[in-house]
Amino acid sequence: MSHGQPDLLNHYARKILTSRVYDVAIETPLHGARQLSERLGNQVLLKREDLQPVFSFKIRGAYNKLAQLTAEDAARGVVTASAGNHAQGLALAARELGIQATIVMPRTTPEIKVEGVRSRGATVVLHGDSFPEALAYSLKLVDEQGFVYIHPYDDPDTIAGQGTVAMEILRQQPGQLDAIFVPVGGGGLIAGIAAYVKYLRPEIKVIGVEPDDSNCLQAAMAAGERVVLSQVGLFADGVAVAQIGHHTFEVCRHYVDEVITVSTDEICAAIK
């Protein structure tokens, strides 16, 4: 980690402080994990983003991105490809802002996820048997229908929306805070958190956590540049990303202290 980009921190700090997320997102609590704290001999706090209206932090970035669109772009409608939390977040954000949203999902997406998106007012298009095929079709719709593509993580407004998580953490825990551990997929959440934390409290470590079979950020940090993983794991599908984002890596390479990995067995043990 280097600290050579103060303009980058200033840029994101301003964007985070002016992000529009609380029209739909809530400030989630920091809950003490008593048993885990006792086992580790340390105070462990959990940021309960599972309490958001769509059960994940993704609503923050999606809403902030849509709220920053010009009236002209908003009128064009938006599209994305997702089978997970980004789809739910974008659907709800679009409904709240009165924007037409189309979500392209692979045909293999479980029906409960499809209905979750439809119930929030978005149009669902089932296409392809994999995420890359769904993504390619969503980009085709951009060309054919004139939609605005909303990236799930690699966008400064999305990163800033996710960064409001850090704003809350530092407000809720103003005293001693040694490290913040952040799950990493494409890097939107950790980039937003790292930018805000290093702007205000640079002594706090920001540590990324990835599955050992989907470690795109760890690989990029080691190489000093973005790399493409030859394959990614299937178990932790929400963070199974082959290449870290361009905008997200721009922040992470300077302001993430460390990236650690966990095995599928360790993930399963933690879920239990």
Task: Show which residues each predicted segment covers.
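PLP-dependent amino-acid enzyme catalytic core
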Residues: 1-272
